[in-house]
């Protein structure tokens, strides 16, 4: 193989994988081409966290099969094959590799430098999903807009601190693809961070399935990671994404101290809460109470007013009543989050939630999404 083409429909974590694959192929003297029809190898990085993203990914795979040369090979990377294994029958002519199986490329390309020897990238390029189909790409952009794709900014330095997570959320199928937590050694992260500063970067983002659970598998914690990073001198800001609520509860006193000391070096923190109904949180298998979350977030807001905190809210989870939904709306209003990432519940194959009774009708889910967006717009108007 001499040339490759790479397209991505993935989240920020899979975007890191895509860049690492590109670095790996270049290291093995396989060169990127902008012309799909000239590529010997076409890699499509997919997403299937939601049905809409699965459909978009499948459309992409079909399109690249149609566009490729007859002798070219298509490899489907990302989460699609593990989240919905049935698609492997639908696309029997392509090879599937999950985020934990990327080293399977070694045999496919007869690699001289194995994938495991390629370091995580810190600067992430853009790999459009449909370069020659702008109307389809626009659809993909709409689907991905809420992901806050800050990692595509040229001035942002990405620090992947871990893969996988420790959660078992009943609605999540991504874990089928990414597996258990695997944290990067602290010294390696600090070394990467310092290298970014040495190169003149001022904006950094921590990437992981759950930043809050960092280090549990290697005997340290996210608190120790943050302390180590903020101990480094320099002019910089760090985005702390996906610091799940249970870890805010667990590490609250230490986090409050860190936030007070270093809030000027924090761009923003994302604390996914998902629901403000304890009943729904239990069904979701989210291991915290909304009372604890409210208590600690309100203390952070009162004592560190300069720290920006955003959240994730899922609406329409099976069994969610209007009263449950109102609890989430009131939570958003009371805290006045400057940004809320809204997820409409979507059945995913083989998840516990997909087997639950009490599915919320789609029109009700759509109305609830609209209601959250309306509240969010009102909050932003007041804050600005």
Positions of predicted regions on the chain:
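Proteins enriched for Cys/Gly/acidic motifs involved in redox and nucleic-acid/cofactor modification
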Residues: 1-210, 291-302, 326, 330-334, ...
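Conserved SAM/AdoMet-binding glycine-rich loop
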Residues: 74-78, 83, 198-322, 334
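Hydrophobic alpha-helical scaffolding
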Residues: 179-182, 241, 286, 318, ...
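Anionic-ligand binding region
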Residues: 353-357
